[in-house]
C-alpha cells in the first residue's frame, strides 16, 4: 500500500525576517557572552532576534538554558537542569544598565526540579534590576510553577513586576502534544491568582497559531483569558525550530491575525499584539504602555 504524506506548506513571504546583523547586534552578543547570560531570543531561535537586538532590546532567560520539560514546539535545550546561579540576577541587572534599558523582560526555563519552580530567582532579578536602574520597568514571563500559589506570591509580592506574563500557548485540545507536563486549567488559575495578588498589574498571555487549532477554539481561549482577568494578549505564528519538533499544520494569514486582534479588542483586552512574527515579548514596552493607559 502506497502512503502519500501531506505536502509541507510553503513558507509565505510575510514570514521573512532580516538576518541578525549590525553594530548593536554584535555589541549585544558580546555583552551577553561576557556576562555569561542566556537570552530566549537565541535559545528559542526567535525570528525577531535581529530586529530586537538592533533596537537594543532582549529577553533574558534565567535559571540556566536547560529545561526540565519537553514541549513539542520549543527549541530550548531539554535535560538535567543546571545548578541555580545566585549571581545571575546581578549580571542581568548589569546588562540592562549597560544596554541603557528602561524596560526589561525576564523569562526562564521550567525548573520542575525546584520546589518553588525558580520563583525566588525571579524575585531576586526583579529587585536587582530596580535597585541598579531606578525607574526601569520589569516584565516577567513565568512558567506555571506546577500550580504552586506560594511561588506566584514570591514573584508578585511585596513589589509586583510591571507586567506578569504566562503563556497558555495553545488550545486545550492540543495540550497533550504541544505542552507536555502542562495543564490548561492550571495556567488559567495561575493567571487569575496573579491578578488577585496585584490587581493594578497588567497580566498577559499568548498563543501560537498554526498547530491545527480551530478559530472557534482560539476565540474560546481568548474568552477564557478575559474571564480570568488577563489584560494583554499576544498571538503569533508557530514556526517549527527543526525536524524534531511539531510540524506546522498551516500558516495563518496577516488578515486572520487582524480579525483576531479586532475580536480581542471587542472582548475587552487592554491591548492585543497579533501578527505572524509576534512573540510574547515582541514590542513588550509598547504593550505595557497601551495597557496602562486604560
Which residue ranges define each predicted feature?
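Conserved glycine-rich "GG(E/T)P / GGGxP" loop and the immediately following alpha-helix
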Residues: 104-124, 212-217
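Auxiliary Fe-S-binding modules of radical SAM enzymes
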Residues: 1-59, 90, 94, 124-135, ...
